[in-house]
Regions:
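Metallo-beta-lactamase
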Residues: 1-23, 28-31
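Short N-terminal or domain-adjacent regulatory/targeting segments
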Residues: 22-49, 122
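Short gly/ser/thr-rich secondary-structure transition/capping motifs
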Residues: 38, 85-90
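Conserved beta-strand elements of the Class I
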Residues: 52-56, 138
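Short, highly selective alpha-helical patches that border small-molecule cofactor pockets
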Residues: 64-68, 72, 120, 150
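Short helix-loop-beta junction
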Residues: 69-83, 158-162
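Helix-loop-strand module that forms the ligand-binding subsite of alpha/beta enzymes
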Residues: 91-162
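Conserved small/polar residues in nucleotide/adenosyl-binding loops
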Residues: 164-169
Length: 169
């Protein structure tokens, strides 16, 4: 969300000898300043730190969780690093941190009362509020009568944020 401001500040500070980084939120850094500034540049430019897939899922009866597990197994068989989160059990901050770290994100959710299962909807709004971008996204929707979660998830993470959306063929 504040990537432009952070990038501008780091550009101005590039000629200075920085001995300490004192963020408003988080640790005060006195060592490895170059490495810390590099991290801030990654985060400010929304550049993934690693190639890999975050799979975040919300499941009511276990079927969406099963689909997420199958996807994770197939990706791992291909040698792709994955991490999974049940958004009903995992604090959103863990998923947000992983989303900033990895290059690809999969969101799998059940349609619940003609909407997105609540914890997934909250996570997606949190990611949108962080202005996370420059990721490849895929969505898995699960529903019987009138599945809508896929469409609704795409709407929350819609442009102007810069994402590449994968579509099933």
């Amino acid at each position: 969300k504040y990537g432009t401001q952070v990038t501008a500040l780091l550009t101005k500070a590039a000629g200075l000898e920085i001995k300490m980084v004192c963020p408003l939120h988080g640790f005060v850094w006195r060592k490895d300043i170059g490495e810390i500034i590099e991290k801030y540049l990654h985060w400010a430019t929304y550049t993934p730190e690693e190639t890999g897939v975050v799979i975040a899922y919300a499941s009511v009866y276990g079927n969406t969780a099963n689909a997420a597990e199958i996807l994770a197994c197939r990706l791992r068989e291909m040698g792709i690093q994955t991490c999974m989160f049940d958004v009903s059990m995992t604090p959103a901050s863990y998923v947000v941190a992983a989303a900033f770290r990895y290059s690809h994100l999969v969101f799998a959710a059940t349609t619940y009362n003609a909407g997105i299962f609540v914890n997934m909807e909250n996570l997606l709004h949190d990611l949108a509020a962080h202005n996370l971008q420059n990721r490849t996204l895929a969505f898995v929707e699960n529903g019987s009568w009138a599945p809508t979660s896929g469409k609704l998830m795409r709407q929350i993470l819609a442009p102007p944020v810069s994402y590449k959306h994968l579509r099933a063929h």
